[in-house]
């Protein structure tokens, strides 16, 4: 059966068709935008470098001075003949990669470059350590502390790259470029700071193990095997 439609009906059908076409075009455009953003994430660059530094030695401080420097002044029976001081550094640079859709929607991933290491690594040996036997034993103990610092940072740098690539390979979406820019540093720090904290906790645990009663007893046995000290030290 043929039906005659009024002009108003045709206009309504035409308007509906145009809306459908517009929605289809917008959907296709959005899919294309998201595909571009995914490729952006796959291209993000992450580098982590361990910056080593030579370990210096200082024998100019007295036992009393080293005790003050170590902060262990509360124990009158505890003498400090050796001390290790590390100055760790953890820095990073972040650069945004983003794409902006025709409607202003923005996706972003960061390029991240991390440098971790030490601005200084010093071991102090008490001035009172005059004979080479005792001095070498104390030096070995302090070098063990320095080695633990460096090993944790060196291994940490190697282990960090893959988790960072995973964390920063998934683009985030924002209503505008301004909104994306505001989230750049919080995003990076939210990923990097927990790692830095875990790294320092691991180092602290290793340092405590080196200074454990078992470790100190081993050092004492070695010291007792040294020839008698001329100045009565250790």
Task: State each model region's role.
Residues 114-134:
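Short, charge-rich amphipathic alpha-helices with coiled-coil/heptad character
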Residues 2-14:
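Bacterial N-terminal signal peptides that target proteins for export
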Residues 143-160:
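Catalytic Zn2+-binding segment of zinc metalloproteases
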Residues 30-48:
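Short N-terminal segments immediately surrounding and downstream of signal-peptide cleavage
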Residues 12-22:
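Bacterial N-terminal signal peptides
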Residues 131-144:
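Short alpha-helix carrying the canonical HExxH Zn2+-binding catalytic motif
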Residues 52, 58, 63-114, 168-234:
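Metalloprotease/metallohydrolase-associated module, dominated by Zn2+-dependent proteases
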